[in-house]
Amino acid sequence: MRRLRPVELDFARSAPLRLTFSARLGAPPSAVYAALAEDAEGWARWFTGVAEAVPTDGGAGREVRLTGGTRFLETVLATEAETRYTYRVDRTNAPGLRALLEDWRLAPDGDGTRLRWTFAADGPGPLRLVLLLARPGLGRAFRVSARALDRRLARAANGS
């Protein structure tokens, strides 16, 4: 795996490519945050394309494997209970990436949660173009994943 450029939280605003998606979930921010930040293994059960996610370094990082074989070693940069979960990719086998950070923001929305995902990346021009063209697919994957997470959290809240 290749090492990527280490970026910090401000990369979510300054990255050459930023894709942001949002969805409303019926679960409260506390439940959504717990699924994002405290249940790494659970991601494979609701996030489209994630085959496996395991915490590393006592929860300070994660190792993620996608269904197509892409792998990421991540460092968690921000864990703000019920409001933010952010990580950067330190190493990957994905070609072309120079830097990647994902920023998840949560806000109360009535009795549910407004979830916003920012995918912030840097790479050569052709890679950025491919990612821009992939925006509709990433958006669809996010919406499908958000609905799957919402169903999962509703089942947990109902004890089933």
Positions of PLM-derived features:
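Amphipathic hydrophobic-ligand
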Residues: 96-103
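Short, solvent-exposed aromatic-acidic interface loops
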Residues: 90-94, 118-125
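Short, low-complexity Ser/Thr-rich regulatory SLiMs
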Residues: 78, 104-110
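Hydrophobic ligand-binding cavity/cleft-lining segments
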Residues: 1-57
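Glycine-rich portal/gate segments that line the openings of hydrophobic small-molecule binding cavities
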Residues: 24, 41-95, 114, 147-160
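A conserved amphipathic terminal alpha-helix motif
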Residues: 1-4, 121-160
